[in-house]
């Protein structure tokens, strides 16, 4: 184990071999204080900074799970959001200066928060359905705007997913969901873990195939979402 300092915050990194026990009870002493350690499963890495876009009236997201577009409405004095499961329209007054940094930050926050809401509406039932199909259960489900992973799972049986998961095609979304659900049984990336993913998905060898496809898609997405 070793410590690293990032932006004045400390994190303890523990590395375990594949197949290591999934439950650990450990305490770390830092500055005379005893801190409990939480062993978390390896994550599916996105290898991006947080997704941010240069948002203009032409901005849109069009995937199987989400249709998001911006509409300039004459006579509108303030922004409006029209939302239904899988469909979002951000209505804005015409003539806005989209070059202002403050406006771009606000627009990106609007997109992220609506993605989070859409995840609760669209992805949460999907996660529940896959969990029922696989005969597994979890404690808490959250959706976060993160830069380094599509999803993660903790030893407390909490599962987390990236709000930008909605940018992926449905087969890859399902793979990420099943990947994290499999971590409820195996908190590693061993052969037993991938067999568990295959079991949940119901197709032998599907985990490895989709993992490779997800890596290719992640690399292509690396060219997007880098606006500051």
Each predicted region: which residue ranges?
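Walker B catalytic acidic pair
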Residues: 180
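Active-site-proximal or metal-binding-adjacent scaffold patches in catalytic folds
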Residues: 1-20, 24-174, 184-228
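Walker B beta-strand of ABC/ABC-like P-loop ATPase nucleotide-binding domains
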Residues: 177
């Amino acid at each position: 184990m070793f410590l690293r300092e990032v932006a004045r915050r400390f994190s303890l990194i523990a590395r375990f071999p594949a197949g290591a026990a999934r439950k650990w009870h450990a305490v770390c002493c830092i500055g005379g204080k005893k801190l409990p350690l939480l062993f978390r499963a390896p994550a599916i890495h996105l290898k991006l900074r947080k997704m941010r876009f240069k948002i203009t009236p032409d901005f849109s997201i069009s995937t199987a799970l989400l249709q998001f577009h911006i509409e300039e409405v004459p006579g509108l004095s303030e922004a409006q959001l029209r939302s239904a499961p899988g469909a979002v329209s951000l209505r804005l007054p015409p003539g806005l200066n989209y070059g202002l940094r403050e406006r771009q930050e606000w627009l990106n926050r609007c997109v992220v928060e609506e993605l989070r809401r859409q995840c609760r509406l669209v992805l949460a039932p999907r996660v529940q359905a896959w969990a029922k199909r696989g005969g597994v259960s979890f404690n808490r489900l959250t959706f976060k705007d993160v830069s380094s992973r599509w999803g993660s799972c903790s030893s407390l049986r909490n599962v987390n997913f990236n709000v930008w998961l909605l940018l992926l095609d449905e087969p890859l979304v399902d793979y990420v969901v099943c990947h994290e659900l499999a971590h409820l049984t195996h908190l590693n990336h061993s052969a037993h873990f991938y067999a568990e993913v295959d079991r949940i998905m119901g197709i032998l060898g599907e985990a490895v195939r989709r993992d490779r496809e997800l890596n290719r898609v992640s690399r292509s997405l690396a060219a997007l979402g880098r606006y500051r």
